[in-house]
A protein has these predicted regions:
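Enzymes that bind and transform nitrogen-containing heteroaromatic metabolites
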Residues: 2-153
Length: 153
């Protein structure tokens, strides 16, 4: 499951964060996976990001409207969230990447290998990311926060 989150970074527009859980081999974890249940329910997982959101983006959200909203003076501190957990929402992730709307990615890396499934970061626009912060939890899950440093042409 992946989540998208806008936050006010103190700049002239809202920032967008992608929040996702993925396996070591890059696939979306199954919803009934024990470690995924922790990510979805623990206050150090997705609930933290839900508490800090105002609006929710869904698949088929008009990205051109989002571009305008992001630069609007009245929306500088608005917080939007979207969960990316299926093929439709993966398309939203790809669209956000295509328009370079992602400023930060928070990845919950689950210490399991599925071998097959829905890839989280397949077909995204090439870009470079810097590690901002990492946290490892007692259950083996590692949260890695990446910040976008540039678009690769």
């Amino acid at each position: 499951m992946t989540t998208l989150f806008f936050t006010d970074g103190g700049n002239d527009m809202a920032k967008i964060q992608i929040i996702t859980a993925m396996t070591l081999d890059g696939f979306l974890p199954k919803a009934d996976e024990n470690l995924m249940q922790w990510v979805m329910n623990d206050d150090k997982g997705f609930p933290y990001w839900h508490e800090h959101s105002i609006y929710r983006l869904m698949p088929h959200y008009p990205l051109l409207d989002l571009l305008a909203e992001r630069h609007s003076d009245k929306n500088k501190s608005d917080i939007y969230i979207a969960e990316i957990s299926d093929t439709q929402s993966i398309e939203l992730l790809r669209g956000l990447s295509r328009y370079n709307l992602i400023d930060e990615m928070v990845v919950y890396l689950l210490p399991i290998v599925l071998g097959k499934g829905t890839p989280v970061f397949d077909d995204l626009t090439p870009s470079r990311w810097n590690v901002h912060k990492t946290t490892t939890f007692p259950n083996g899950i590692t949260r890695i926060i990446y910040r976008n440093s540039c678009i690769l042409q």
